């Protein structure tokens, strides 16, 4: 503090500067010409010598010369003090929802306090809905609606209640005094508007900007209550903008910087609460920064201060890759370049207004989008990443997608356009003359046509202007048509890496094609920051989901439908539940079950069924089963890159759907043997489709449950080996029966035991007939290249002929012991020869035939060594001729069968790009 007496002269010795405070060197000023300045915060105090004048000088470095002060509070300073600039500043902007009520204002104050930056400038919007309320006041007054008075009272009450909840004592009295004074002035102004029936733009801007004044004042009081020094800034005193012809404003950075220095010299503080949205013209007329003006205010202030960063606080966790209201899978983007953010903003993404980015780009100041209601979310950083940024190289080439709806496409076409200078100028001159805005332009390289998109509300004026301007060309035939295509939308794909990544456009258009979406027009600049397409408005959401899924969902994200939630299907669902998190985290395999259907009820979901509750949900919320709706849900109602139906039934009707599913691009996985062992012509048609398409059909579990029988056979064939013979025990039930048909036990006794243990089908005749084994033989034969049908196989049935006509399972089981003698004799004969009986299927590839029969094997033969329900398959090939290749293991049971199906699902994922 300096103390000056009247007629007292202060002279710096040797012209050295007087040092006040300890600001950084960049704030140290030496200006040769003295300037006259009224010092801030003078106050008189009592004391000897006729009264002292105390001058509290702000914390600056000054170069000063002093003059005599004779009873006046003036002194000659070398120059006006400049505000310090640089990374010591952080700028925050809080939108209307952030200061929507008293508690939220407290939350904002807490964020400010917890920011460890040396200096902070905070830009605030009006409280939520207040700006709309202010403009509504103006509209009502202009239309001479007396309710403007009650509406003004509502504005007053909203702020009065908020202030009373936040403030007390002198702070409350001071704020309410300012508030009531402002309301009184507004009432007079609105009365004038009411009488005139009109309000000028500057008049309206002045009225509308009061919400920011009140919220900034309240917040500054709240921050000061915590003990921190804080000043509030009316940015109309600082920000100077020039109106443009497009009803926008351009900042005058030079003049604004001067006024900021002047303001700071009078109001030094390390925390400044500034009004957003409002500014002044060079003539000091109040104005606004128009749409998203508070964001723009923060960006301008950040640039003026050369701040470390500008944080935009809002009510979302950051910038999404697409509108989350339209795309469930939209993700928060960690980083965006300035160009990417600008492009996404231009094309309608709710990020920032494009002009907000311009001021900070000048000084490479990052913008951070944060959620005031979720402080743990890191948000999105908008900055210019280094060209060699490793993380950037690993990201998808497309950062995000945005759409603009309610557009119309105008196509100007004609052979007379080619090579004629000025045609494009004339076209877009017409657009300018009617005040329309061109959103996108596309021109054929032949110059035969130009098409462009404009807002639909402006298309009639534009088309009429064009037809008037080119009427002679239309009559002469130089132009063939001026066509208007209404009800359009623009879809833009944005990404800085698109410029260096081949195939992005191919991927984009293939995704649209798969979704059956037609593209009306295409535009891409040479910078390749965006690819823009025009589509039907009705296809806008569908297209957005399609392209987003193609770029942002892993190629190993599978939309799954499970048919048959019986024993096998239920076990599979439980296995998926237990393993899903591990697969997603460690292998990037995202399995989403969108449908479960039985014969009577089905359960569908758009985002994925909760597999921890699928039984409960199916029972409580299941609807009537409908395979067409089920298929549509799994494949047609979303844009997950891949769809797969898993058929866990033994139903021929379900198997008959495979061809249609594969043709639609749905992968099929199944243990159901009916399709591969059915009529040969249908099987060949199915396999032909599979070979010609890129859709996969896996059926490992049809033969060996969880054993790798099919994959082993294919591996032999694909590596050039030749199959001579396949022989095996491939029925877990019949393996169990003959492994236990020993000693004095009767065959019927073993069958009864197996049935009671759940090893057989509900009707054991389904196992004993040999049909199941025969189907497996047919599958193996066809895999080996043999064209066999079930009718071509001799099958040894273990069902006694007289019992085939039994009308019930009970009757069959009751009469079965009567026929134990024949099998007992065969077993005894085998034992007398040192052999055992085994029920086997045989593929004789050399002689092009197959059989299902009861055979005898030496006790040292691998087939005689089985136990329980194990299966065993022996492959005799040109490579494995003397010693067959043997695959052995459990061949029955819900767990191993479901495991075999699960293995096929993971195999499909690996084919689609999952890491090995």
Swiss-Prot record:
What keywords tag this UniProt record?
Answer: Amino-acid biosynthesis, ATP-binding, Chloroplast, Kinase, Lysine biosynthesis, Metal-binding, Methionine biosynthesis, Multifunctional enzyme, NAD, NADP, Nucleotide-binding, Oxidoreductase, Plastid, Repeat, Sodium, Threonine biosynthesis, Transferase, Transit peptide
Q: Which GO terms describe its biological process?
A: lysine biosynthetic process via diaminopimelate; methionine biosynthetic process; threonine biosynthetic process
Q: What does this protein do?
A: Bifunctional aspartate kinase and homoserine dehydrogenase that catalyzes the first and the third steps toward the synthesis of lysine, methionine and threonine from aspartate.
**What InterPro entries has UniProt attached to this entry?**
AceGlu_kinase-like_sf, ACT-like_dom_sf, ACT_Aspartokinase, ACT_dom, AK-HSDH_N, Asp/Glu/Uridylate_kinase, Asp/hSer_DH_NAD-bd, Asp_kinase
Reactions performed catalytically: L-homoserine + NADP(+) = L-aspartate 4-semialdehyde + NADPH + H(+); L-homoserine + NAD(+) = L-aspartate 4-semialdehyde + NADH + H(+); L-aspartate + ATP = 4-phospho-L-aspartate + ADP
Q: How is the cofactor bound?
A: A sodium ion is seen in the structure; a metal ion may subtly affect the relative position of the nucleotide-binding region to influence enzyme activity, and could increase the stability of the enzyme.
Record localization: Plastid, Chloroplast
Q: Which domain of life is it from?
A: Eukaryota
Q: What is this protein called?
A: Bifunctional aspartokinase/homoserine dehydrogenase 2, chloroplastic
Every copy of the ACT domain together lies at 412-487, 493-570
Q: Where is this region: Homoserine dehydrogenase?
A: 563-916
Summarize the subunit comment: Homo- or heterodimer.
Its annotated pathway reads: Amino-acid biosynthesis; L-lysine biosynthesis via DAP pathway; (S)-tetrahydrodipicolinate from L-aspartate: step 1/4; Amino-acid biosynthesis; L-methionine biosynthesis via de novo pathway; L-homoserine from L-aspartate: step 1/3; Amino-acid biosynthesis; L-methionine biosynthesis via de novo pathway; L-homoserine from L-aspartate: step 3/3; Amino-acid biosynthesis; L-threonine biosynthesis; L-threonine from L-aspartate: step 1/5
Gene that encodes it: AKHSDH2
Query: Which positions in this protein are listed as binding NAD(+)?
Result: 568, 649, 893
Regulation of its activity: Threonine interaction with Gln-443 leads to inhibition of aspartate kinase activity and facilitates the binding of a second threonine on Gln-524, leading to a partial inhibition of homoserine dehydrogenase activity (25% of activity remaining at saturation with threonine). Homoserine dehydrogenase activity is also partially inhibited by cysteine (15% of activity remaining at saturation with cysteine). No synergy between threonine and cysteine for the inhibition.
Annotated positions binding Na(+): 700, 703, 705, 707
